[in-house]
From Swiss-Prot:
Catalysis performed (reactions): D-glucose 6-phosphate + H2O = D-glucose + phosphate
Pathway(s) per entry: Carbohydrate biosynthesis; gluconeogenesis
Principal location: endoplasmic reticulum
Active site: H119, H176
EC number: 3.1.3.9
Keyword entries, A-Z: Disease variant, Endoplasmic reticulum, Gluconeogenesis, Glycogen storage disease, Glycoprotein, Hydrolase, Membrane, Transmembrane, Transmembrane helix
Cytoplasmic compartment spans: 50-60, 139-147, 203-209, 276-291, 342-357
Protein's name in the database: Glucose-6-phosphatase catalytic subunit 1
Topology within the bilayer: Multi-pass membrane protein
Impact when changing R170Q: In GSD1A; loss of catalytic glucose-6-phosphatase activity
Gene that specifies this protein: G6PC1
GO CC terms of this entry: endoplasmic reticulum membrane; membrane
UniProt organism field: Homo sapiens (Human)
Superkingdom to which the source organism belongs: Eukaryota
Amino acid sequence: MEEGMNVLHDFGIQSTHYLQVNYQDSQDWFILVSVIADLRNAFYVLFPIWFHLQEAVGIKLLWVAVIGDWLNLVFKWILFGQRPYWWVLDTDYYSNTSVPLIKQFPVTCETGPGSPSGHAMGTAGVYYVMVTSTLSIFQGKIKPTYRFRCLNVILWLGFWAVQLNVCLSRIYLAAHFPHQVVAGVLSGIAVAETFSHIHSIYNASLKKYFLITFFLFSFAIGFYLLLKGLGVDLLWTLEKAQRWCEQPEWVHIDTTPFASLLKNLGTLFGLGLALNSSMYRESCKGKLSKWLPFRLSSIVASLVLLHVFDSLKPPSQVELVFYVLSFCKSAVVPLASVSVIPYCLAQVLGQPHKKSL
């Protein structure tokens, strides 16, 4: 088993080395792709846009992103996946030959296990939702039929082009092995396809959001404590990252498994608070919500304010404080874009709109 994994890892190292040597000019592109593929952009950019254009799509997108990343965390704890940037330096596989030279970058040194790839899984799930939802919206509305078929082909080609670039980016940056990004893409699609058959998420009560958030948190902590009780160190990757990352400042606490868990659960709970708030009912369920300028204003205001909000980083000196603030910060994102911002805009635009009617 170990020998087989060593061969698989060596293939990944050779792939990374090949990309870094032959595509040096593409370094900035691969870094950009990796940054864009970060799940944070699904919360801060894609969710506000889709929610105010097609509310149901926005809700499903966020659920797929959160549950997908939660499952990614559980998978990583089970699979114990290595990462190329530390494995190539830590293994004795190359004891009888020269160690391949692998470059590291500021976005390389993530601290969690490597399998499956979170970037690939998140991107696949989120973009699968967007493609299938877009096709569902335009199905029967675009005639003749061949135009819809052209749209279908274009969107799916775009989808796979995005997945290919994300996968190559993660391999190039020595953050993942090839088999890890493939597993991420397949897992992300599976999560998104599953949620296409779950309709209860669109009218879930605040109690249901609370119970699901509590269950996800309790399961993750319970699973962590169980494995720890069995002698399994689930934070083994943090030591690897701190030991083998070229620059200590490239190791960030916000890439640890618990940071990801708290951010995702905060986002889901914040969505529940927002969708069950009076501000949401007054602004997004009234006649004004059908007015295109109101929707566009909500999108623009959300993107601007969330961009400013994203620049505020919780202090990381004390881990517990960092995790609590990360949860609260993530909860504010959907709360602001779904209820607070539309409500404030409704107060400003409501009276002129009524007069025009």
